[in-house]
Amino acid sequence: MDSTNLCNALRMEFEGIFENKIPLDAFPAKIQDMILALSRQENYSIEYMMASLLVAVSTAIGNAVNIRIRGGWISNPALYMILVGRPGMGKTPPLDFAFRPIRKHDAKIIKQFKLDMEHYNSLVENNKAKKDKSSSLPDKPILRRTIISDFTPEALMRALDDNQRGVVVYVDEIMGMFNAVNQYSKGQLIEQLLTAFSGKPLDISRCSIPVPIHIEHPFINIVGTMQTTRMHELIEKGYKDNGLIDRIIFVYPSSQEISDWGLDEESSVSTFGKYSSMWDSIINKVISLPFIENEDGRAIHNVLEFSSEAKAYFTNWRNNAVRAVNQIQDDGLVDSRVIKAPTITARLALVLQILRWACGEEHKDFVDIDSTKSAIALSEYFENCYTNIQKYMLRESVEPQKRELLDCLSATFTTADAIQAGKEVGLSERSVMYSLVSLATNKVIKKVKRGEYEKLQ
């Protein structure tokens, strides 16, 4: 272990990262160092920061590099991600930091586009003034921006058509986007997002679009923030039933405490500048990966394979998860997210391999065993986040008096324990029995055997 890794390990031990099972060691050493430094200095949440960097790298890669998951199954590294937490948790600052280099890249492109349009419009006007109008005009400039924040579904599809390397839907309070989707597009955008995630072609025909849009290999990332109390709205909109939620990575820190501010150190500005510059260089290196299109405008993908060792490890991990699902007899107890996990995990492995290359720590010839193991660790961490969100939503859905009853009970309890606790909170024996049936039906508790129960949250 070199000095940087040793230093990072000691800092992670001090911060309680290992204790909270946060897989910060899945990242390259210089990224670990950056996350730890900015967490202490800027109060960035380590967990939000980890996730923000991943989706930023994924965005920078776009359709430039794909991964072969199995046989003919090839995938881009697209990720749908939502940072969840109470107000004041600091969800936005790490996201802004992670995407700052891509915003700078977009700003340069927009500036050049404006100049190109001025030149093009000037040529058009000059051509109008000529008697001989046979002189040809150059192609009209196209704006190939990456970050899309304020948009209609049609505008998003146009932006994706113009920039087939890929775009990211970046919305701070993301429930606003979902509400607008339901109000204006009758759910069409959600269907397009489901299609894009699966890597299937998008075809859009509208009266307002003179030439129909066909996108053979759509790449759309989604990233945003959401308050914990609004999570239930995603369920109510039917996004669990249609599978959208199964495709979203939710990031929910192990601690929901808002950190104190420390006093600024004299070197804080220069330290922030140092890491900001380093991150700029890393993202710009990823953006420099060539995205090649043939004469028909179709992408020629650079496809990375798993190494033989990585493929065996990944396949074994996936098979173990599926075997566990196959043991479940009740279809209602099957977690549909398990089926999507291999796709998301393979994409994370690709993102990590490219990030390690951009940091100067590894190659980009194939996805190795280290990137694969790290991706699995991250995937399992993110699923734990989702489980904790589910527990929160279950708890919030319980009526206040039943919640009081639960608070008086241990993790495992008997009917007699519940009746005694009911007396303490003013519930009759009959009310307690009805409450136990209701809580078990809603999967807040589980009946282990006659007269014995276990809390599921």
Identify the function of each model-found stretch.
Residues 1-457:
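Phosphate-handling catalytic cores of nucleic-acid transaction enzymes
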